[in-house]
């Protein structure tokens, strides 16, 4: 489903997703999230809202 994460950017942009309970990483157009606890694992997903350095990510995840 749709996932969003916001946060400060890093050289390898990282952001924390409270909605999906996982850390995100990515570069323009892509973002990946790993869940934890009952939320499980979320693989790499396409992101149309990924902006490297801005730390803002959103996209569909498998």
UniProtKB/Swiss-Prot annotation:
It comes from the Eukaryota. Keywords: Cuticle. GO terms for molecular function: structural constituent of cuticle. Component of the cuticle of migratory locust which contains more than 100 different structural proteins. This is Cuticle protein 6.4.
């Amino acid at each position: 489903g749709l996932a969003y994460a916001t946060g400060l950017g890093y050289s390898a942009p990282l952001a924390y997703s409270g909605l999906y309970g996982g850390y995100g990483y990515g570069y323009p157009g892509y973002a990946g999230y790993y869940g934890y606890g009952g939320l499980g694992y979320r693989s790499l997903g396409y992101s149309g809202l990924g902006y490297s350095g801005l730390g803002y990510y959103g996209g569909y995840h498998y």
